[in-house]
Structure formats: structure tokens, C-alpha cells
Regions:
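Short, basic, alpha-helical segments at the C-terminal edge of helix-turn-helix-like DNA-binding modules
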Residues: 48-54
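Amphipathic C-terminal alpha-helical segment
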Residues: 82-85, 95, 99-102, 123, ...
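Short coil/turn segments at alpha/beta junctions that flank glycine-rich nucleotide-binding fingerprints
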Residues: 10-14, 65, 86, 131
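Amphipathic alpha-helical packing segments from all-alpha helical-bundle domains
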Residues: 55, 85-91, 104-131, 141-142
Length: 157
């Protein structure tokens, strides 16, 4: 999976091939084909696994915190932990957001990293308003999009 994640990140979905992934994984192309009937199936599995490793783990960690700043910080910390063990994870997530614009059929709603992170940030902002951290006249859509842009911008970095 790591080899596939790296190849998809470096080459993009269209240019990635089972052969390139097999070479990176030190396997044969038929070995990969045995487990994944198509590039789309492999890509979706990589998306699902990477989202669970980075986004879902970050959200779970952030839900333990009690303030907006601590929740966003916990999310970043969890993502950085995932990145420190597998440098391809964050790069792939950023690439997957771009690929979803080119190929909407590749991403299921359940495993859409951008949507999941946006929902998390909206929840965290709503909670911050309820707790009085942010004023009730806060422009929720604007602050959510700004925070999501910062999160994903850090992913590009």
C-alpha cells in the first residue's frame, strides 16, 4: 500500500500504473493484480487506508480536547505523527483531494478527506461558539473555510 501511495502521489492517478507500483514494492505486476482487480480498486483502498490513518485518527484525537485551539492542535499533532512514520501519507492525501476534482468517481463520500476535515472543523467551530470561545455572530462558513485552507495548506508544505 505504501508503494501505491507513493506512486499515486508522485505520478497522479492517470499516470500511475500497476507496473510502476510493482517495481516500487519489489513485486510483480500480476501479484498486485491478484489482490486488486483494477487501478480504481487499489486507489480506493489506498484512500480508505490513508484516511483512517491520518484524518480519522486526527479527528479522534482532537475530540479528546476541549477548546477550538486544542482541537485543531491535536488534529495537526496526530497528522504529524502519521507523517513521521510514513512520509507518503500527507502527500497522498493532498494529491487525493486534487484527483477527486479531476476524477470524482475515485472518492466515496465516506472516504473524502476534504469533506471529513471540513465537517470536523465545522463541528469544532460550532462547539467553540456554544462554549463561548467564539461569539455567536461568528461567520461560521468563512471561519470553517479559512481553517480548512490552513489545514490543507500545511499538508502541501
Amino acid at each position: 500500500m505504501r508503494a501505491a501511495r507513493e506512486v499515486f502521489s508522485e505520478l497522479g492517478y492517470d499516470a500511475a500504473t500497476f507496473q510502476a507500483i510493482a517495481i516500487r514494492a519489489d513485486l510483480t505486476r500480476p501479484a498486485i493484480n491478484h489482490y486488486f482487480s483494477s487501478k480504481r480498486v487499489l486507489y480506493r483502498d489506498v484512500v480508505e487506508q490513508t484516511n483512517a490513518k491520518v484524518i480519522a485518527a486526527g479527528i479522534a484525537k482532537a475530540r479528546e480536547a476541549t477548546t477550538l485551539l486544542n482541537r485543531i492542535s491535536a488534529f495537526f499533532a496526530a497528522a504529524m505523527d502519521a507523517e513521521s512514520t510514513d512520509r507518503s501519507a500527507a502527500a497522498f492525501l493532498v494529491t487525493s483531494v486534487l484527483e477527486a476534482q479531476r476524477h470524482p468517481e475515485l472518492i466515496s463520500e465516506e472516504h473524502d478527506a476534504l469533506r471529513s476535515s471540513r465537517e470536523f472543523v465545522k463541528w469544532a467551530v460550532d462547539e467553540a461558539i456554544q462554549r463561548g470561545e467564539l461569539s455567536t455572530d461568528t461567520d461560521i462558513p468563512a471561519i470553517v473555510e479559512m481553517l480548512v485552507a490552513v489545514m490543507w495548506g500545511m499538508g502541501f508544505y
